[in-house]
């Protein structure tokens, strides 16, 4: 079984946030191109604990959405626990209204789903004033509960794979307000793994800078001079030091030597410099 540029033994478990049928599970299926052993976690904190305890060898974590932006707490988790990003995957998010078979939308009293899923489908839901919206922990878990308890009059918003897995009927497909809705996921390991440099053309970095004029501009100039393309920059406040920020950046490059040169310069210019991952660029 191959994951990007990494091979993974069949018995390696992968931690996901949510359960089978969730978007995290869908990423595993697309990235692996086949089923894999899954560790289902109710939160991202539990996912990280699972990885650190060696209960799973890999983890899949959502990190950014094209509409909602960065999932900032997940950046902090990766940094705090020194996790390594070994790959990425971009998933088109399609939300579907589903319920037990044989029902019409007019018979649905409540829709249960994750708050983000409800928000992404608000235009459709506003046209269904008879339906009460109920926030839940996970899209797929809601679908599973409807199936297990045979809950009539209750619908879920989840993926097509959840409908298939839990034998639900899709009452309205792709009800998300914005069709071009994509989430970026990263593949994580507990420990660093050596990767052939010819396979690497993207890196995720973290550093801190003194709060003085031109410090960030100088770093960005180095990246530009070394022929790196900045695809993401995210600042995160340092809780213990008010008004000081850590910067998380993603860069792509054609030649690893250019990246190596930039990395050596940034290690001198910035404090607390850290490589969060070096991997293959999968951005569409």
Where are these regions (language model features)?
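Domain-level signature for soluble enzymes in the chorismate/prephenate branch of the shikimate pathway
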Residues: 2-284
């Amino acid at each position: 079984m191959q994951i990007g540029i990494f091979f993974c033994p069949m018995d390696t478990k992968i931690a996901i946030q949510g359960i089978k049928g969730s978007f995290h599970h869908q990423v595993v299926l697309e990235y692996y191109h086949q089923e894999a052993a899954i560790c289902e976690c109710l939160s991202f904190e539990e996912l990280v604990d699972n990885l650190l305890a060696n209960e799973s060898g890999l983890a899949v974590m959502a990190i950014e959405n094209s509409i909602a932006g960065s999932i900032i707490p997940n950046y902090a988790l990766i940094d705090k626990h020194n996790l390594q990003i070994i790959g990425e995957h971009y998933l088109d998010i399609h939300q579907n209204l589903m319920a037990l078979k044989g029902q019409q939308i007019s018979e649905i009293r409540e829709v249960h789903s994750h708050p983000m899923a409800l928000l992404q489908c608000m235009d459709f839901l506003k046209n269904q004033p008879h339906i009460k919206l109920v926030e839940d922990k996970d899209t797929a878990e809601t679908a599973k509960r409807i199936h297990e308890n045979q809950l009539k009059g209750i619908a879920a918003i989840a993926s097509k794979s959840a409908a298939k897995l839990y034998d639900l009927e899709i009452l309205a497909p792709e009800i998300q307000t914005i069709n071009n809705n994509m989430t970026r996921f990263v593949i994580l390991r507990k420990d660093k793994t050596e990767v052939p440099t010819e396979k690497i053309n993207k890196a995720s970095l973290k550093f801190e800078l003194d709060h003085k004029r031109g410090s960030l501009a100088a770093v960005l100039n180095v990246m530009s001079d070394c022929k790196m393309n900045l695809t993401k920059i995210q600042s995160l406040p340092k809780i213990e030091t008010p008004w000081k920020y850590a910067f998380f950046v993603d860069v792509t490059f054609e030649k690893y030597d250019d990246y190596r040169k930039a990395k050596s310069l940034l290690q001198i210019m910035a404090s607390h410099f850290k490589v969060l991952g070096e991997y293959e660029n999968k951005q569409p």
